Amino acid sequence: MGMLEARELLCERDERTLFSGLSFTLNAGEWVQITGSNGAGKTTLLRLLTGLSRPDAGEVLWQGQPLHQVRDSYHQNLLWIGHQPGIKTRLTALENLHFYHRDGDTAQCLEALAQAGLAGFEDIPVNQLSAGQQRRVALARLWLTRATLWILDEPFTAIDVNGVDRLTQRMAQHTEQGGIVILTTHQPLNVAESKIRRISLTQTGAA
């Protein structure tokens, strides 16, 4: 039994099958990239794995239990960062981290922002930051969260090369400590092929 399991997932949109019979099992320490052409259903799959959407058939299990039966404990173990940063634009970068991580002290939040490349921008309202900086505010949570499972939809969007390298290193550290990372990205990952598992979406499931 793996940590996270997709079992015979079917997803249809507008009378079109995105994928069917999609099954896979993820274990502690795995780093997974979901691949596929535009419109293949990558974001849709991530939303199914987070429990935000339901498949047309099949189920997702966490530690052997269907998500709907363990929703609270699952979400305590999950960090989801989607296409939209999901941050409060009227708050500062530092206030955003305090909002999402109420048990984190100011020093920890400042360190997380520095790791994300936002040193010197802590007290600026998010609506005054660039798109890339706003993305970094959301991604700074990677240095604070205690969640086991990270699901990240295009985390490198609007991030420069140095930022991508820093984020990649943080993901590597998380998986080395037994965490799981699932992501989509159009950018090449500067990681040894042996460290990345790729699940390619096709209409008949995963290739």
Curated annotation (Swiss-Prot):
GO cellular component, one term: plasma membrane
GO biological process terms on file: cytochrome complex assembly
Gene Ontology terms for molecular function: ABC-type heme transporter activity; ATP binding; ATP hydrolysis activity
Membrane topology annotation: Peripheral membrane protein
Domain ABC transporter: 4-207
Annotated keywords: ATP-binding, Cell inner membrane, Cell membrane, Cytochrome c-type biogenesis, Membrane, Nucleotide-binding, Translocase, Transport
Compartments (UniProt record): Cell inner membrane
Catalysed conversion reaction: heme b(in) + ATP + H2O = heme b(out) + ADP + phosphate + H(+)
Binding sites annotated in the UniProt record for ATP: 36-43
Assigned EC number: 7.6.2.5
InterPro entries xrefs: AAA+_ATPase, ABC_transporter-like_ATP-bd, ABC_transporter-like_CS, ABC_transptr_haem_export_CcmA, P-loop_NTPase
Any Pfam family hit: ABC_tran
Entry similarity comment: Belongs to the ABC transporter superfamily. CcmA exporter (TC 3.A.1.107) family.
Subunit (UniProt): The complex is composed of two ATP-binding proteins (CcmA) and two transmembrane proteins (CcmB).
Chain's role: Part of the ABC transporter complex CcmAB involved in the biogenesis of c-type cytochromes; once thought to export heme, this seems not to be the case, but its exact role is uncertain. Responsible for energy coupling to the transport system.
Name recorded for this polypeptide: Cytochrome c biogenesis ATP-binding export protein CcmA
